[in-house]
A protein has these predicted regions:
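Active-site glycine-centered loops adjacent to acidic/histidine catalytic or metal-binding residues
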Residues: 123, 147, 169, 184, ...
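Conserved AMP-binding A3 loop
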Residues: 8-25
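Conserved ATP/PPi-binding loop(s) of AMP-dependent carboxylate-activating enzymes
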Residues: 170-174, 183-216, 254
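Gly/Ser/Thr-rich phosphate-binding loop
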Residues: 66, 86-94, 103-164, 176
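Conserved AMP-binding/adenylation subdomain of ANL enzymes
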Residues: 21-41, 51-90, 105
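AMP-binding/adenylate-forming catalytic core of the ANL superfamily
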Residues: 92, 198-199, 204-205, 212-215, ...
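Short, exposed "boundary/linker" segments that immediately precede the start
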Residues: 1-7
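Beta-strand->loop->alpha-helix junctions that form or flank phosphate-binding loops
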Residues: 143-150, 169-171, 275-277, 319
Length: 341
């Protein structure tokens, strides 16, 4: 059988490491022509134990002779900007919260972005607000992709210069993506379903957890991601939300990403997270947590939501926080908010 090595990425996933190498080759096939050997300066604000940073920055782009600028503490926005000042950056690998945090900082706009030709996003949903803020400051479009630790990580990525905003692009070379229903059968055209992946970048399984591996692999060896997606008319993949984060209100499916997108489009809302909490009447209710840039009233934000959302999707409670809970890479932790109070 396969020899399984243990690497130190989150949740102890096993791989023969060929999947990481395969993903490097796949990513270079998608974006490599954008990079001149030995001439690129790539900003990597994510820790190298995170598979996104490891495969894309440390392995794929480093193999092109790129200089990788590491940011030890991306939460320190002032320090982050100071680190960037001596560099004429050509590429940036980030996530949604970083694009917003940097883009709203007045000192960031003073940096030289004349050579910045590729901004990559992954790890968490990218909001339209983040795209607008980033492009307004840097002049650069954010190119979004999608992946997981189990897929080393990249499954799909937009073609630079041909981005379909709001999607994570088409699957990489030698990668198959299926959208499945609850019975692991393909959904119809235009319907949403669980994203399942088959390709050389997919893991062998969870380390010493054959029972958990069996839960996520189909009979024909597709890995079930736990994410809900849909195809656009062009065949690009659009992420709807995490299956486990979906909220069911009176039998209706509510996706937090959709509501967070509306909330962050409010000019005074910086970040938003939406979760479902138990409700005696409706099963679950929609609860929102936001950070703001100005002194605004919750009632005003609720009214803003009512203008753009069907009633059952409007948050029944909105709480303003100083800061949203985040992981070490800046990903908003909905589960902590779900357990809050």
């Amino acid at each position: 059988g396969d020899h399984r090595d243990l690497h130190s990425f989150p949740t102890r996933r096993s791989s023969d490491l060929n999947n990481v190498l395969a993903n490097c080759i796949q990513m270079l096939d998608r974006i490599g022509q954008q990079f001149k050997d030995g001439e690129e300066v790539v900003v990597c604000p994510l820790p190298l134990y995170h598979i996104y940073a490891f495969t894309v920055c440390m392995m794929a782009l480093f193999s092109k002779g790129s200089q990788i600028v590491l940011i030890p503490n991306p939460r320190d926005i002032d320090g982050f900007i100071q680190t960037l000042k001596p560099h004429s950056i050509t590429a940036f690998a980030g996530i949604n919260t970083l694009f917003v945090g940097l883009g709203r900082h007045p000192e960031f706009a003073k940096l030289d972005f004349s050579k910045l030709h590729l901004t990559m996003s992954g790890g968490t949903a990218l909001t339209q607000a983040a795209v607008s803020i980033w492009k307004g400051v840097t002049g650069n479009t954010i190119t979004e992709g999608y992946g997981l630790s189990e897929t080393a990580p990249v499954v799909s990525f937009n073609i630079p210069g041909k981005e379909e905003i709001g999607t994570v692009g088409h699957e990489l070379e030698d990668t198959e993506v299926a959208l499945l229903d609850s019975y692991d059968k393909p959904v119809g055209d235009g319907e949403s379903g669980q994203i399942a992946v088959r390709g050389p970048q997919v893991m062998l399984g969870y380390w010493q957890r054959d029972d958990e591996t069996a839960k996520v692999m189909t009979e024909d060896n597709f890995f079930k991601t736990g994410d809900i997606g849909v195809r656009t008319d062009s065949g690009a993949i659009k992420i709807v939300d995490r299956l486990k984060d979906m909220i069911i209100v009176s039998g209706f499916n509510v996706y937090p990403n959709e509501i967070e997108e509306i909330l962050t489009s409010h000019p005074d809302v910086m970040e938003a997270a939406v979760v479902g909490k138990p409700d005696e009447k409706t099963g679950e209710r929609v609860c929102a947590f936001i950070t703001v840039s100005n002194d605004i009233k919750v009632e005003d934000v609720t009214a803003f939501c009512k203008e753009q959302l069907t009633n059952y999707k409007v948050p029944k409670s909105i709480e303003i926080l100083e800061e949203l809970p985040k992981s070490t890479v800046g990903k908003i932790l909905r589960r902590e908010l779900r357990d809050k109070g």
